[in-house]
Amino acid sequence: TRVYAAKLATITETFIGNALQQLQFSAGVQGRQLSDAVALQVETDRVLAQSMAFNSTFVIDADGTLLSVSPAPLRHLVGGRMRSPGVDEALHLRRALVSTPYVSAANNLVVTLSQPIIDKQGRYLGYVGGTLYLRERNILNSLLGEHFYKDGSYLYVVDHQRRLLYHPDNQRVGTVVQGNALIDQLPTLPSGTVALTN
């Protein structure tokens, strides 16, 4: 179980690294066409369709205005000023980022991966982002969710604030875990496994 958990952690890190690379490439493309709404949308659609790594993809300018978004049902938000912890974090930090979980403008619990858009003069123009809807199907939760053990054990993922990012019981995703001996020990554990009875 320990070896398998370590392998899943490595696969997850690789997935996030690859997703950030896709966004970095797109940020370079989008930086050359910010004034062309059609070209922006085509590239935003391409990133979503390319690998199915994200549930949605988008471009936000330096003022927080949504310039393009995919899939199509979210396009009614284009032109609006986006206000959320994830947007604020990306606009403030202006670097490659995996956000803390937050509720999006479309009312989804999400984690956003983002890459800044920087022009040739080094000016920050905004960012390209991709979201993982934590309560809906995506590649990451498919990977984690397909692995139950015959003995009834399972895995779950928590962030540094004790919020469940993945759990086999989808209703628990987004909740904060209290009174859990394993999670209480996490800050003191370098790595490894802990036997715990649920």
Feature-to-residue mapping (PLM):
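Extracytoplasmic/periplasmic ligand-binding sensor regions of membrane-associated signaling proteins
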Residues: 50-53, 57, 62-133, 137-139, ...
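Extracytoplasmic/secreted envelope proteins and their assembly/folding machinery
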Residues: 2, 20, 24, 41-45, ...
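Juxtamembrane extracytoplasmic/periplasmic/luminal helical "stalk" adjacent to the first N-terminal
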Residues: 1-38, 46-53
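Solvent-exposed, extracytoplasmic
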Residues: 36-53, 73, 83, 123, ...
